[in-house]
Amino acid sequence: MSGGLDFACVGVRAEPYAVGPTLVFRVRITANGDDRRVHAIALRCQLRVQPAERRYSDAEAEGLGDLFGERERWGRSLNPMQFAHVSVVVPGFDGSTEVDLPVPCSYDTDIAATRYFEALTDGEVPLLLLFSGTAFRGPGGFQVEPVPWNKEALCRMPVAVWREMIDQHFPGCGWLRLPREVLTALRGYRSRHGLPSWEATVEQLLTHAEADADPAPRLLTTEGSPA
């Protein structure tokens, strides 16, 4: 008689050979009941960030202001965030097995989860893995069982793992997604000013913006009134 399945996340690593940024979660699956033979599982997994499950330094809190507001609001604003939704076919096993769950990631800083990861300087990212799908079990044939949504596993991913993954694909760099017309305008500005790189282009724009934001001091006459 079958007794359901249990799931646990036993590790997470950056995949060095992936075409794009990819995390690999190692998941242990245990079959319960008298008959522990599983022919296959069509498994789905939703990953959520649980921001309320860790502490934050002042520097991290400042970086998270655009997501959660001021610290005074965090009692209401630190809500779970969707990170990814992936699927995998688990081969047959008897009793228990471990499988890799590859999760492609984005470095798009307009995505809330990416901005959250980038704001963290140390420690761990609290994640919740929620499983669903279909399991095929039975000694003499296939018995189809759903994997209910209440099957979940906690994972505390080191921030260093995220940074390692990003550095493998974007070493020492950040990434911004801009509308095509903005890129066209930037390209024209770079060309008109003969700038050697995009970095030099942005730095010059920032320098000019800061200069415009700081008005030149006004000279005073000997009587103390503006010249």
Model-found features: residue ranges?
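Low-complexity, acidic Ser/Thr/Pro/Gly-rich terminal tails and inter-domain linkers that flank the onset
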Residues: 1-24
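Contiguous beta-strand segments within globular domains
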Residues: 16-29, 38-47, 103-107
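Internal, hydrophobic beta-strand segments that form the core of beta-sheet-rich folds
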Residues: 44-50, 98-150
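Short aromatic-acidic-glycine turn motif
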Residues: 47-59
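Short beta-strand elements
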Residues: 62-72, 136-175
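Extended, solvent-exposed segments with strong compositional bias
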Residues: 63-119
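Surface-exposed, Lys/Arg-rich phosphate-binding patches that contact polyanionic backbones
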Residues: 180-197
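Short, basic amphipathic alpha-helical segments that act as recognition/interaction helices
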Residues: 196-217
